[in-house]
């Protein structure tokens, strides 16, 4: 202690024992700074160590008290020569840091002072809730905290927050508990105030006051059912004592460590949505709030506050009650309710919302006797609709809204023989006020009379429509009121134009519109309709230039350099069209030899002109079973042969398959509606003759046409509907009022809006109206499922009698003509293979005799007999034989095939070669004399674990096998369950195996199993946020979640099962079961798929799972490298089993490879999760490995179940429940009847143990207890949600052990195969740079993973580097890429070194790698330029190669390559 410091201690009166403390022995005052103006003395002390907190506080107190006596203030800073400290000392000083200075701010102090801290080097970790981890604190407060600790003598810290979920929850809980107390106190204060007011008031004249506290409390808090309800959308800030009413759409309960329960739920009133919170004391009290459940309607009261954790407004609920919500009902009497004939399900791609089950249930609830489904272009809702209708007891009418096209759209109308080069043409164009020749007006007719390409006369007249032109018309055409105000009368213009056109060929672009408009006006003025030839240059161009994507007038004139100054003014359009005509005439003569007008339709129209034809909608319905097959054929043809952008049905194709079908005229996109609007009733009558009934829809459905200015107003719309009715009446065809349903409830409209708008402005439905910032898509129609009374209201303008006829009478009458149909068959229809039963039996016994001798041991004979009885008796032999043929073919190509699923439970499958898993009891068998010995007492879980033994008969070493798996787990207890045989082919051989299926059964009977992809929850969330952005909306989080839920589940695309192939029996055809299509509408795909999701028909047809897997590919690669037959690798190799207990067998330590066992890169056991299980359980036998495999794949089998039992010492790895089959086997060994043991296994494996009735469950428990099954086993059963089949586990473990064998005994082969086949990401620079670089890169990625900053590629790379590190530690190396030795895709062994392939280089794909290898076989690369050219490499890749030293001294160019470039 220095003299100056000792003097200071005396002056401060510090206790003697403290002055003598070791901490102050070498104390010194470094300097003192006196601030005279502020009267602050600043001491700088130096101590040997950081002071104990008690001495520090005493020193601080002494200085403060002594200097305050003279009106001064003393502060001090400390330097410690040694900065060693304990976390306990740090914690003490951490709290002290908040006592004064900048850290003493109340907000910072209240959140941080009581938290736990720890130091690691210069990092100070503060453990706290999510609320404290804010940018504000990091930026403004944590640096001050570091400075304050530095003044106490600590090193300079970098302060970081370490989030703790438990603290987050506790802080939230404490906040709400305190908040509830404040609210309660406020209510009680209000009550006391009311009581005081009442006491001050004069008493009633005849009655004494009664003070009832509960009554006053009720008065202060109005009853919830009488409280005023606030719409959620009106609440944008914090408010107290609000009442909401709405439906719950999400609910979750959390139990805190203290036992309190937080009920989080979300509600919507369809104006917006809100998050709610309700805290209750414990789980028992939480049961009182079971009314908070999904889809329940509640009225809630509470305070709306900003939640500090979600950063969104949240209601803290004080009280709530269930309310009765009014549901829409069909109010018409029974027998007077409608039938909906036009309803879309969520299978209408990106267009409609309800599942077919919802439509059926709604119709049934409303008492409708039938309902029809009409999805766009597909029938994928049929199977689910079929089952739903049977369940609901309602008639379902099966339909489709199809896209009908004309097969051949004419180029020439009214054609005659005429030399194209000698004809005189009138090329004309009209401008109108709209698209309807009936409801809109001609405002300009212009034409150019042309001969041999020259204009010889012109016609151009405006016409006054008799009303001001709309802004839309003027904007589109450039024609103003001034243009037309002094124009000639329409009739005069028409007469003059007819005279102008005499003896000519008329020409127009999209002539059907112009000719239709002119004919309608001619007819209206009693003038003859057009009869001379008409050329449509739109169709002329489409057939002459099919390769062009666009054939509009604008794109064509631009392409051919024809001037078009004012598009949409008739005179300019006409002349431009004429110039194009003569280009086409010249082209068609030169390229196609067509010179005669009459030959254009014959010689030029393409067979696939339907691809460009205008689509018209029609509804097609299945009348009977013949119709069902025909609609399947139509859907198939439209989605395969005639698919172009969308599914299309050419009219002639529809005609050929029309038997058993009923046709409706569909919506505003149908041709009847179109012709009624554009050409009038007479023309529409001719078109409507094709249909069986006419559809009319509510005006609200057609209303978007008004917004698009295609229809003038609602009055005109009603006139169009009346015209449609007239069409039906004139033809004697029924007219039906249909609803074009796209969702069930009116409030669901927003979900469809979000889905449709997500398609973007390129979609026709989203084409904008208006311009610039005012451009918006037309509104969508109100397309909810309407009740009868709602439909009658929509058609009230027709009068009650007519409305009832359309809505009720006609729909019910038409429903009567539809017959019941069988959409999904009730039986399994397996394909036919000649002598399948005999072959399966023959193959089975042949192999069994070969292994077990003849006669067979009883246990083998009985098992075969039992299985064959089920297999052959239920028609499953063909399934077994087909699988056997596929496996045999792959084996012959040199690949092993692994089984998956429970097929290994079948001994017949083992004998005929479908699976290598032997399901018999553990047993020995002699390969020399067929002696066998079976162990049936359960003492061994696997035959591979039995000790080695020699044959007592011949002394030959016995082989060991048998996994003890009952057959019942494959085909059910009665052996009649359809077998699901899944096979793992090598990924390399899978395409060949698929083609084998076609070869065996025929191309017309084998199809890939189809799938339907719907909008996922995350995608729907993206759609909502996109809608928010694009349409200027703002939704709180709860509303976004609600909207995303509503938008999810809509069909988005189709696909195919990765390996599933559906086989149709050759005595039927595919249309007996399903239509077909291409996956994702890819008409270039090699395979067609089932149109139905394969799950919908999997009980009717055979599905073969021909899957691709890496394991067989690995085994094949290892066999090729080593020459070792994988079938001869033992399953009980000591070295292999040693991998599961340590790393010694690899010659490395756990520290070297970062894991305590040798599991890295071993299939099934190499993941972090399973490696952790291995570390905990230390398996030593094959049976225990099976257990691990089952435990790792099951749900709630390991975590919270077997893991706890093993940790607590109640059971071990061999006795816990691992695989589903173990339950049946264990219970039978315990003494239960096989049937009951099987049933218990089925209940447990499907997670049904706690869902079955208490009576049933108790029966099983009593039986188990009676047979001394331990209590822990029974409890374990109750926790399981899903279990893995033992046969699947056995097949996977056998493959894994083969791979592991090479890792132990032939490591260089193993690493070569692993990196060639399994590794997903490479960093060849790091991989070849040695251990230090590898470990450093792993550490970098590991750090990123901790902070959730690692990319998927980096995560994959980390897995690769783990194996790379292990390989280097074992003494092997990676070489550099070698331009002349590296392979395209596979690693190359060079002694103890692996040379990487070209695909391991970042950015170099497989195709380029193969091209590079082919190029080098042609000769050496003489320059980088040649390498780029011949090798197909980009400049960037060549530069990378050069940087990596792969190219050596290769020059940039050479004389030869320069010569090649020049010539």
Curated annotation (Swiss-Prot):
GO terms for biological process: DNA-templated DNA replication. It is an enzyme of class 2 (transferase). GO terms for molecular function: 3'-5' exonuclease activity; DNA binding; DNA-directed DNA polymerase activity. GO terms for cellular component: cytoplasm. Its EC number is 2.7.7.7. It catalyses: DNA(n) + a 2'-deoxyribonucleoside 5'-triphosphate = DNA(n+1) + diphosphate. Gene3D superfamilies: 1.10.150.870, 3.30.1900.20, 6.10.140.1510, Metal-dependent hydrolases (3.20.20.140), Nucleic acid-binding proteins (2.40.50.140), PolC, middle finger domain (1.10.150.700), Ribonuclease H-like superfamily/Ribonuclease H (3.30.420.10). Pfam families: DNA_pol3_a_NI, DNA_pol3_a_NII, DNA_pol3_alpha, DNA_pol3_finger, HHH_6, PHP, RNase_T. Its main location: cytoplasm. It is found in: Cytoplasm. It comes from the Bacteria. Belongs to the DNA polymerase type-C family. PolC subfamily. NCBIfam families: dnaq (TIGR00573), polC_Gram_pos (TIGR01405), PRK00448.1 (NF001688). This is DNA polymerase III PolC-type. It comes from Streptococcus pneumoniae serotype 2 (strain D39 / NCTC 7466).
């Amino acid at each position: 202690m220095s003299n100056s410091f000792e003097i200071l201690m005396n002056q401060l009166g510090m206790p003697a024992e403290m002055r003598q403390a070791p901490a102050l022995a070498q104390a010194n005052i470094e300097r003192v700074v006196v601030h005279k103006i502020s009267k602050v003395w600043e001491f700088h002390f130096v101590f040997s160590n950081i002071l104990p907190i008690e001495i520090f506080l005493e020193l601080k107190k002494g200085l403060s008290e002594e200097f305050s006596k003279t009106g001064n203030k003393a502060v001090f800073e400390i330097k410690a020569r040694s900065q060693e400290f304990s976390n306990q000392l740090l914690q003490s000083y951490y709290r002290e840091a908040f006592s004064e200075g900048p850290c003493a701010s109340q907000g910072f102090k209240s959140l941080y002072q009581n938290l736990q801290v720890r130091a690691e080097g210069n990092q100070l970790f503060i453990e706290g809730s999510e609320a404290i981890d804010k940018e504000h604190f990091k930026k403004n407060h944590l640096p001050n905290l570091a400075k304050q600790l530095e003044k106490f003598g600590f090193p300079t810290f970098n302060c970081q927050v370490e989030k703790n979920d438990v603290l987050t929850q506790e802080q939230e809980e404490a906040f709400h508990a305190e908040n509830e107390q404040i609210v309660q106190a406020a209510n009680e204060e209000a009550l006391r105030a009311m009581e005081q007011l009442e006491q001050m008031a004069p008493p009633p004249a005849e009655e004494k006051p009664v003070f009832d506290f509960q009554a006053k409390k009720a008065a202060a808090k109005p009853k919830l059912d009488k409280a005023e309800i606030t719409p959620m959308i009106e609440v944008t800030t914090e408010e107290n004592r609000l009442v909401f009413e709405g439906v719950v759409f999400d609910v979750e309960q959390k139990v805190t460590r203290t036992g309190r329960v937080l009920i989080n739920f979300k509600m919507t009133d369809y104006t917006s949505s809100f998050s709610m919170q309700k805290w209750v004391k414990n789980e028992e009290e939480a049961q009182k709030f079971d009314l908070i459940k999904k889809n329940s309607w509640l009225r809630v009261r509470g305070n709306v506050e900003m939640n500090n954790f979600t950063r969104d407004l949240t209601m803290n609920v004080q009280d709530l009650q269930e309310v009765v919500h009014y549901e829409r009902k069909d109010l018409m009497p029974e027998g007077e309710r409608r039938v909906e004939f036009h309803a879309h399900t969520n299978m209408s791609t990106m267009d409609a919302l309800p599942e077919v089950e919802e439509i059926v249930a709604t119709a049934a609830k409303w008492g409708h006797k039938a309902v029809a489904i009409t999805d766009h272009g597909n029938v994928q809702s049929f199977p689910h609709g079929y089952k739903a209708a049977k369940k609901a007891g309602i008639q379902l009418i099966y339909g489709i809204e199809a896209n009908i096209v004309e097969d051949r759209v004419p180029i020439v109308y009214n054609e005659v023989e005429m030399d194209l080069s000698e004809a005189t043409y009138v090329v004309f164009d009209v401008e109108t006020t709209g698209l309807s020749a009936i409801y809109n007006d001609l405002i300009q007719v212009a034409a150019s009379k042309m001969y041999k390409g020259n204009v010889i006369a012109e016609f151009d007249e405006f016409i006054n429509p008799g009303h001001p032109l709309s802004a839309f018309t003027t904007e589109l055409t450039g024609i103003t009121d001034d243009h037309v105000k002094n124009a000639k009368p329409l009739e005069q213009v028409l007469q003059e134009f007819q005279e102008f056109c005499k003896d000519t060929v008329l020409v127009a672009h999209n002539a059907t519109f112009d000719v239709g408009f002119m004919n309608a006006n001619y007819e209206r003025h009693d003038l003859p309709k057009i009869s001379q030839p008409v050329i449509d240059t739109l169709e002329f161009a489409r057939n002459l230039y099919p390769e062009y994507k666009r054939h509009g007038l604008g794109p064509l004139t631009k392409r051919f350099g024809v001037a078009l100054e004012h598009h949409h003014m008739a005179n300019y359009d006409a002349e431009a069209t004429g110039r194009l005509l003569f280009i086409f005439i010249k082209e068609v003569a030169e390229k196609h030899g067509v010179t005669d007008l009459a030959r254009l339709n014959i010689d030029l129209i393409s067979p696939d002109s339907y691809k460009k034809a205008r689509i018209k909608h029609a509804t097609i319905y299945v009348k009977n079973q013949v119709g069902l097959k025909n609609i399947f054929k139509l859907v198939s043809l439209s989605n395969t042969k005639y698919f172009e952008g969308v599914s299309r049905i050419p009219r002639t194709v529809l005609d050929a398959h029309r038997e058993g079908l009923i046709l409706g005229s569909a919506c505003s996109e149908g041709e009847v509606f179109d012709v009624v609007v554009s050409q009038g009733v007479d023309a529409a009558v001719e078109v409507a003759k094709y249909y069986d009934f006419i559809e009319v829809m509510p005006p609200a459905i057609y209303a978007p046409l008004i917004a698009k200015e295609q229809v003038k107003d609602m009055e005109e719309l009603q006139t169009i509907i009346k015209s449609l009715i007239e069409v039906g009446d004139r033809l004697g065809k029924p007219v039906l009022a249909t609803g074009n349903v796209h969702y069930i409830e009116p409030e669901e409209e927003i979900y469809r809006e979000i889905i449709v708008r997500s398609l973007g402005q390129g979609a026709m439905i989203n084409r904008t109206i208006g311009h610039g910032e005012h451009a918006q898509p037309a509104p969508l129609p109100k397309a909810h499922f309407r009740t009868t009374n709602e439909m009658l209201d929509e058609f009230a303008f027709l009068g009650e009698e007519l409305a009832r006829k359309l809505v009720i009478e006609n729909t019910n009458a038409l429903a009567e003509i539809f017959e019941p149909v069988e959409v999904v068959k009730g039986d399994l229809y397996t394909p036919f293979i000649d002598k399948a039963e005999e072959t399966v039996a023959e193959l089975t016994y042949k192999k069994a005799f070969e292994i077990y001798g003849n006669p067979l041991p009883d246990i083998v004979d009985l098992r075969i007999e039992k299985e064959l009885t089920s297999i052959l008796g239920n028609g499953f032999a063909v399934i077994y034989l087909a699988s056997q043929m596929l496996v045999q073919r792959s084996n012959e190509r040199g690949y092993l095939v692994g089984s998956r699923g429970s097929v290994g439970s079948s001994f017949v499958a083992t004998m005929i070669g479908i699976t290598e898993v032997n399901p018999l009891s553990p047993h020995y068998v002699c390969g020399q004399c067929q002696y066998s010995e079976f162990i049936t007492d359960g003492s061994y879980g696997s035959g591979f674990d039995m000790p080695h033994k020699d044959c007592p008969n011949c002394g030959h070493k016995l082989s060991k096998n048998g996994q003890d798996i009952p057959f019942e787990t494959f085909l059910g207890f009665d052996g009649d369950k359809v077998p699901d045989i899944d096979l793992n082919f090598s990924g390399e051989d899978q395409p060949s195996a698929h083609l084998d299926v076609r070869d065996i059964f025929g191309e017309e009977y084998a199809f890939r199993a189809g799938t339907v992809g719907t909008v996922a929850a995350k995608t729907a969330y993206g759609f909502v946020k996109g809608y928010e952005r694009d349409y200027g909306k703002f939704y709180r989080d709860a509303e976004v979640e609600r909207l995303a839920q509503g938008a999810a589940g809509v069909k988005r695309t189709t696909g195919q099962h990765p390996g599933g192939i559906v086989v149709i029996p050759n005595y039927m055809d595919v249309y007996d079961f399903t239509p077909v299509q291409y996956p994702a509408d890819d008409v270039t795909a090699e395979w067609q798929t089932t149109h139905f999701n394969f799950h919908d028909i999997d009980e009717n047809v055979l599905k073969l799972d021909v899957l691709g897997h890496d394991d067989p590919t690995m085994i094949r690669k290892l066999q090729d490298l080593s020459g070792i037959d994988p079938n001869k690798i033992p399953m009980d190799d000591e070295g292999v089993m040693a991998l599961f207990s340590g790393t010694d067998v690899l010659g490395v330590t756990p520290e070297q490879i970062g894991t305590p066992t040798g599991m890295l890169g071993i299939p099934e056991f190499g993941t972090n999760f399973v490696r952790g299980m291995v570390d905990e359980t230390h398996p030593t036998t094959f049976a225990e490995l099976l257990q691990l495999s089952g435990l790792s794949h099951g749900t709630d089998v390991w975590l919270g179940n077997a893991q706890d039992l093993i940790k607590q010492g109640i059971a071990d790895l061999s006795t816990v429940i691992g695989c589903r089959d173990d339950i049946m086997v264990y219970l039978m060994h315990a003494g239960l009847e096989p049937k009951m043991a099987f049933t218990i296994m089925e209940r447990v494996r499907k997670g049904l143990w706690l869902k079955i009735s208490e009576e049933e469950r108790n029966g099983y428990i009593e039986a188990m207890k009676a047979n001394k099954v331990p209590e822990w086993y029974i409890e374990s059963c109750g926790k399981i949600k899903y279990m893995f089949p033992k046969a699947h586990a056995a097949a996977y473990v056998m493959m894994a052990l083969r791979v592991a064998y090479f890792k132990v005994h032939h490591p260089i082969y193993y690493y070569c195969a692993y990196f060639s086949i399994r590794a997903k990401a490479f960093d060849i620079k790091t991989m070849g740079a040695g251990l230090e670089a590898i470990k450093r890169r792993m550490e970098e990625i590991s750090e990123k993973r901790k902070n959730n900053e690692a990319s998927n590629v980096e995560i994959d790379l980390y897995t690769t580097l783990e194996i790379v590190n292990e390989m280097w530690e074992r003494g092997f190396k990676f070489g550099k890429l070698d331009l002349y030795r590296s392979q395209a895709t596979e690693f190359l062994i060079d002694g103890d070194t692996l040379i990487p392939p070209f695909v391991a280089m970042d950015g170099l794909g497989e195709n380029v790698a193969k091209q590079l290898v082919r190029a080098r076989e042609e000769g050496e690369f003489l320059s980088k330029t040649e390498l780029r050219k011949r090798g197909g490499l980009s400049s960037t890749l060549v530069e990378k190669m050069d940087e990596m030293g792969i190219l050596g001294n290769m020059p940039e160019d050479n004389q030869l390559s320069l010569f090649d470039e020049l010539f």
